[in-house]
Structure formats: C-alpha cells, structure tokens
Amino acid sequence: FYKGYFINKKSFIPLIDAKIAISKDYLTINKKKDKWITNKTSRKIVHFLRSRYDCILSTSKSINHDDSLLNCRINGLNNNKPDLFIVDLNLRLKKKLSLNSYIGNRKIYIITNKKNAKRTLVYKKKGYKIILIKRLENKDDFNLLFKKIYKIGYSRMLIEVGLTFLNALLKNKTIHDLYIFKSSK
C-alpha cells in the first residue's frame, strides 16, 4: 500500500506497474484472430487492476492494432476511467478510434517528439492533450517522461503495451511490478 507513496516522494515519479497477456507459446499477438488472447477471468482481473490506477500508458501501435478502450468495465467500478497516456512519437494514432468517445470523460494525452503543428492541431481539436518530449531511448528519457506525468498529478500508472516497448521498459528497469497473464491456448 505504501510502496507507491514512497516511490512518489523519493523519485517524483508514479508507481509504475505493467501488464502483458501472452499465449501458451509466449506470443503477444493472437494468430487465430480471436479478439482476446486470455480468458474472461483474466479480463475481469485486468479491469479490476485498471481501477487501482489513476492513469494508463500505452502506445499508438497497441491502440491502433486493438482499438482498445483501456478502461474499467466492472459494475460499480465502470465510472473509473483512468486517464490515458499514448506514446506516439511519430503521430501515427488513427483518427477514428473507439476511445475517442471517452475524451469528454477522461483526459487523453499523446506523447510525441514531433513538433508538427498541423498534425498536433488535429488531435487537439478532438480533445487530446499533447506532451512534447525530445526522445525516448534510455532510462534518463523514460524517467524524464515519468517525472512530467507525476508533475501533472498522476501517482499510479499501469502500462499496457506490446512486447517491444515493454522490453525497453524492463531493460531500463523502470517497472516496479509486472503482471503476466498467460493463456492456456
């Protein structure tokens, strides 16, 4: 319970946990084209997990692929829509996504290193907020980003990304706890 508090006060970053779903053969993409890799119970646990965080970080690649809402869909907790940070360094987030319907109910930030005013204006008009960073290549870059997120007011972050981005976070030792959901298929 106090772990997040101590991390916040010592490092001025959010508590950073991550979750990943993998198939029986350790893949993160479902080749059978089913909507989900894991089962209904795992999904309920993930929705409960999301309810415990004030923000979620994902990537445009993951969101574009899944068209995911990244919210909590448990009765009684379904009003809990953690704010969303989307790492989109090259501004490739699709314009038509299901999560656009939640912009009025939750803050959605796009993290980019592109200063393209025309492209960022399109997202701003939809209600996205833009966070500009120089790069995201090493531990210092990640810590700088996480300090910005903490400074905005977020103290607990759940990361839901693909294997490539997750590996970068693990390599740079920026994750405090990792939840792995392994499918029996």
Regions found by a protein language model. Give the residues of each.
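Active-site ligand-binding patch in enzyme domains
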Residues: 3-7, 11-154, 164-167
